[in-house]
Amino acid sequence: MEIFHISAECYPMAKVGGLADVVGALPKYQKNAGNDVRVVVPAYDTKFKKENNFECVHWGTVKLGNFNFPFSVLKESSDKLGYELYLIEIKELFNRPNVYGYEDDIERFLSFQIAVLDWIIARNKVPDIINCHDHHTGLIPFLLQFAYKYENLKDVKTVITIHNGLYQGWFGFDKLYYLPEFDLKHIGFLEWNNCINSLAVGVKCANAVTTVSPSYLNEINYSANGLESLFNSVRNKSKGILNGIDIEIWNPLKDQMIAANYSIENFEIGKQKNKEKLCEQFELDPSKPLFSFIGRLFEEKGGDLLPQASALALSEHFEEINILILGSGNAEIESQLTQLRNDYKGNYNVFIGYNEELAHLIYAGSDYILMPSRVEPCGLNQMYAMRYGTIPIVRRTGGLRDTVIDFGDDGNGICHDQASVGDICYSINRAVKLYDDKISFNTVLRRGMAADHSWERVCQEYIEIYNLIIQQK
């Protein structure tokens, strides 16, 4: 079947979070399974775009109300990604370094969605499936069904995959005229709390709804930033599918970004070499257990808990542990974490920002990864960590609940229930004791490394959903 994935992010073209990793991996495995797969994202001004070759396969003009924006469809020439990657180039709106955070984001992603559909209908070939990802593409199922200009695409089956339901793409009805013409009797599909809610539109109109873990599907039925009743009403067309990870990229045996390669058979030597390299870089002691955090420094990820939790844990275990933070986000949290460097030099360090190569080294060189998330629809970091023999310390929520079992229950990690400084510190205390028991520590570590988080299983679950909705009239 022919499958289109439409997304705001796709690794390695543009990455802000886990959305990019999923959209960069799932299509590759779907193509390996014999499908014709295309990924479409905006043409941001990124390093990948500058360093790779593209050919223009279509051009046109997006009409956004009274505004007209020329656009081009650029195809990545090498096909080295394992699927066909297309960029929608609207220079006035997307020739910028960042993915999000602009005042005209509504206009940017509306124009992107319209340009995608304008191109698809111009191909004179109707795809079997369009899989939309998050609110940035949530209007596509509505436009396919009801916009006059896309009449010939109305039978295309659509799936919307929710990677994070907190972000919903709200905008007012004063911008309704941006949309291609449709019969106003269908306007109710757009409305949610007297506004247009892009995510809600997608959930209402798509043939199927998926979330990125089974537990997250359950959680959004009682906590979804105002959409709880909607998610309850569409349970019959919804499924939670736990994400996989790209085990070709995330492979400690072949990873070129780490100091020494290793496998489950010889992890002790390999991890120690990576730990020494990492600790040398950040002036830490490689003989102590290393607790690391990789992620965005926001409340959603528990980032606001890290300064106090780090300070308390270091005060209690100053001679026993190291803590390393890699992340960016809230300026106040960044400042607090940076200030700790002076108080706990030699046991603590922080890198404000994000660096992919450094992230790989941290997964390889750390003993524990901290994930105190308040919300974690799936979470990929815990899977990356386990793949590299680093034990996750997590709060039980979303995909963390589905992937990490406490070592007290013969599991692969350390779990707590509350998003609190106290629970984080208690888990660190347990981790220190576990680290001192090398036999038990290595047993937990091996369980994580042995887990199967590959995309083959995930790919098949998506294909089953596609086949099911294609059969529906």
Curated annotation (Swiss-Prot):
So what family is this one in? Belongs to the glycosyltransferase 1 family. Bacterial/plant glycogen synthase subfamily.
Cite the EC number. 2.4.1.21
Q: Which InterPro entries match?
A: Glyco_trans_1, GS/SS, Starch_synth_cat_dom
An example of a Gene Ontology BP annotation on this entry? glycogen biosynthetic process
State its role. Answer: Synthesizes alpha-1,4-glucan chains using ADP-glucose.
Pfam families, per this entry? Glyco_transf_5, Glycos_transf_1
> Could you tell me what this protein is called?
Glycogen synthase
Q: In which pathway does it act?
A: Glycan biosynthesis; glycogen biosynthesis
MF-aspect GO terms: alpha-1,4-glucan glucosyltransferase (ADP-glucose donor) activity; alpha-1,4-glucan glucosyltransferase (UDP-glucose donor) activity
Highest taxon, organism lineage: Bacteria
Instruction: Give, as one word, the top-level EC class.
Output: transferase
Instruction: Kindly list the positions annotated as binding ADP-alpha-D-glucose.
Output: 15
PANTHER family from the entry? ALPHA AMYLASE DOMAIN-CONTAINING PROTEIN, GRANULE-BOUND STARCH SYNTHASE 1, CHLOROPLASTIC/AMYLOPLASTIC
Q: Which HAMAP family match?
A: Glycogen_synth (MF_00484)
Species annotation:
Flavobacterium johnsoniae (strain ATCC 17061 / DSM 2064 / JCM 8514 / BCRC 14874 / CCUG 350202 / NBRC 14942 / NCIMB 11054 / UW101)
